[in-house]
Amino acid sequence: MRLPRRAALGLLPLLLLLPPAPEAAKKPTPCHRCRGLVDKFNQGMVDTAKKNFGGGNTAWEEKTLSKYESSEIRLLEILEGLCESSDFECNQMLEAQEEHLEAWWLQLKSEYPDLFEWFCVKTLKVCCSPGTYGPDCLACQGGSQRPCSGNGHCSGDGSRQGDGSCRCHMGYQGPLCTDCMDGYFSSLRNETHSICTACDESCKTCSGLTNRDCGECEVGWVLDEGACVDVDECAAEPPPCSAAQFCKNANGSYTCEECDSSCVGCTGEGPGNCKECISGYAREHGQCADVDECSLAEKTCVRKNENCYNTPGSYVCVCPDGFEETEDACVPPAEAEATEGESPTQLPSREDL
């Protein structure tokens, strides 16, 4: 019995072999698409393997389930569950490759139990076996069993792409990723394995884990009595930071931090480390504090009715709401109105004298 076809099936995997368009460079490669279909098929096998009839008749169940295990009915259930109805790309791929999947299920599964190897590598030829790469599935650098000596990634590993070169993990370098980068040392190396371990942070090169095993000190460190120790850049003369900053030493480096806004020069963070106080601030209890000019014995705002408001490092003089501001005073509303309503002063007439 043949399974119903969703569409006319081609023998060549045209869809999977089409190269991705330049504008769609991030789309899955043919190998990724094939692997995804196989992963879904394998999951379908797991899901349908759990199926049982729960009737309690063991002999009947064994006979029935045995037939179901390799039946076309089970295959159809797996195929029907591979793609969501909205997944156009998955459904299109399945239509193109359903005949291959049917042939493997009904005839070749026992001989080729690894569906990925048979379907994606040998039949469609869009993938390679792990540890191999390129159109001819050549072995990666270091061999297919341990590409890049286990310390890197082989370009094109498992696909028909790439050049087989190694992209080494952090700490490793060389064509086979067996050499250690600066900042790492070889803690194990034999014919099959190479392990690079990070040096102490003070070492540029090293032969062991401590700051006494450095071959060369990192920038910001200096050799002192056989060990690489931190250079205190903040103790240098002249100081490395500007007059409005203070220096903060760190392992192998330093930072320049801004002084508090109340300071003119400083030795550290906050108003308690000012060298001098900025105008509007004065030393109080060991730190620069704002001077409240409005509370001074000598009056700060001298115009009549004027209010004084303190601000950080300064003050402002303001007339109350509704008062008219003049050069000499803040005039209350009633006085201002009276002044505006007065007639000009007239000289007395001769008759009045």
Curated annotation (Swiss-Prot):
A Gene Ontology term for the protein's cellular component: extracellular space
E.C. numbers: 5.3.4.1
Residue ranges of the region described as Disordered: 332-353
Main subcellular location: endoplasmic reticulum
InterPro entries assigned: EGF-like_Ca-bd_dom, EGF-like_dom, EGF-type_Asp/Asn_hydroxyl_site, EGF_Ca-bd_CS, Furin_repeat, Growth_fac_rcpt_cys_sf, LE_dom, NOTCH1_EGF-like
Composition-biased stretches (Polar residues): 342-353
Entry's localization field: Endoplasmic reticulum
Keyword Signal in record: yes
Keyword Hydrolase found: no
Family note: Belongs to the CRELD family.
Name the record gives this protein: Protein disulfide isomerase CRELD2
Organism listed in the record: Homo sapiens
Gene field: CRELD2
